[in-house]
Amino acid sequence: MLLRKYDIMKPHYILLTCLLMMAFLDISAQTIPVNKRFGKVSKEELELSSYDLDTSATALVLYENKWTSVHLNAAGAFNKTTKTHTRIKVLKEEGLKWGDFEIVYYSSNNNHESFSGIDVVTYNLDGGKIVETKMPKKYIFDEDFTENYRKLTFSAQDVKVGSVIEVKFDCVDTRYWNLEDIYFQKNIPVNLMECEVRIPEFFSFNKKMSGYHSVDYAAKTESSTLQSSGDSYVYNIDIDYYSAADVPAFKKEPLVYNYRQYYSGVKYDIKSLQIPGALYEDYSVSWEDVDKNYLESDLYIRFKAACQFKDETAAIAAEATDEKKIEAVVKLVQEKVTWDESYAILPEPLGQVVKARSGSNVDMNCLAAGCLRELGFTVEPVMVKLRSTGVLQNYQPELNPFDTFILRVVTSSGDIHYLDCGSSKGYLNVLDPLMLISNARVLRPDGGSEWVDLTRLCVSGTNMYFVAGYDPKGEIIGTLTIRYRGEDAYLAKLDYASYADEDAYMEDLEEDFGVEVVEYSSTGLKDFSDNASEKISFTYSPDTSADLVYVNLFIDPFHSKDTFQSMNRSCPVDFPYPYSISYRYTLQIPEGYAVEQVPENIHITCDELKASVKMVTLADAHTLQAVFTYTQDNILGLPSDYENIRSFWQHLSDIYGSMAVLKKM
């Protein structure tokens, strides 16, 4: 089994008589006054119909309090207790979902979380009187979720627009070192949140703040007494107080893979535990510790397992090139096992995977690794933290920072290929954009692990050629040829596969382009390859006025102003990958017509994105031509650069309205 932080750290049993005194410091003044006691919901809170600081809010956190204490229980073992109290106001229909609660929690043989005191009350006004509806305990459901995890679900009763929902519960966790990240920001506004964290001086934690909204902080200490072996020891409890008022909803913006990493919050990471004369444990880790953790786990054992398909692999050895052999192995694994569309970190026993004919991406990667080693390739796991779970900081080691792993395959000639066998939409060096991170780690024994950048494994782009003619009857009849490569091919395949059939795909294409498709063909959209193409013949009617024909030079825009509607932005812009677009438009001018007007030539750059756009339009008596190119090398735009990026994007999007005018002679 893969060793995790909560399996390595064992509770330490010490005799103790401990008195804990609760206190809280009210630091911030919120816009809406609230009585913080559970059940003390005011008529004013129920009469509230909108939130002045954000009239678009569908719901509002009126008050939230989190109290966390690391302490010793009656048996002398360290535990962590967290008490949560939340009060939410429903302002619009879309906010009704805030009455549904889901808690995924840890439960294994060694360590576990346990919940108690779950109390959920809904408050409504009826004839000017406050009516309370309590949730019966029978509506609390506790079920298996995944390995070592369970899920609690429950829902407030009689929730409607105008309701106030109040919930409280306690959680005791034997993983005392694992303090939950505290977020003062959500995707709805927060009127007031208060938090208290109580930690005995024996513990040392690193604290890291995140986000852009200010959070008030204060600290103090209290004394307590530890009884051990007949001796008494007076020690301090360090108490952190946090308070945040009028916290705006975190606005979801395009081109963000993980919103939570930008929420205003605080994260606690344990460094050490020291009880003088009794115990010292250092919980800080290096990347070498992280490597060792994985190398000594079932992850690496199953990665090194023998080939499961020896006969088929022997036949693959006859392929002409190393690339063809690798490609054949991936196809073999994908024929034998269907991807269950999950990204995992720990492979299942490979025999079970083959028998089930279904598995995670790492199950399939382990099967491919065995075949590739059988063919003489050097194969190594590359540890990846998916972009959807946040950015990995390689200067700040964590024991289990990764979400999954892919394969690094080295050929006899020294060529290096990265691959993931889960998705059939990828290829060698063409991965799901979620995996395109700058800090992936090649896992090697004996201290040989290294960091690698996966953001530029292949050249990605789209080439488009549109050749058409204008029928004097009033229609443009043309053929659009599209060639995708690299990551663009991956996304094109993913898009194509999302439709039930080709007819549904055509119907959507006609709606998007505003055309009538006459003929369609494609290659590579269902293949394991790094390219794909489409050929579409269609007709459409341009706008006309008297003897003028207005020809839009773009069938469909490549970029949109809607991407960056906000005037400012507090989180980075995270593009999927570097890419380019090449588009050539050719229109044959019919006899009796002439080009009256063409757009001006354009060249715009954006230093922040290392991006450039050019458009050149040419015309003679017989042909109208436009050539458009776009290139972008940077994939990350900083908030400080957002104004320039947005301005560039606006000018870029304006290009797609470019019109040429034909005149009947």
Question: What label would you give each PLM region?
Answer:
Residues G76-A77, F303, E319-I326, Y499, ...:
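Generic detection of long, well-ordered alpha-helical segments
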Residues M506-M665:
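A carboxyl-terminal module marker
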Residues K336-W339, M435-A440, G592-V595:
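Short glycine-aromatic motifs
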Residues W287-A356:
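Secondary-structure boundary elements
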Residues Q30-K292, E348, D363-A369, R373, ...:
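Beta-strand-rich, non-transmembrane domain signature
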Residues M1-P33:
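Bacterial Sec-dependent N-terminal signal peptides
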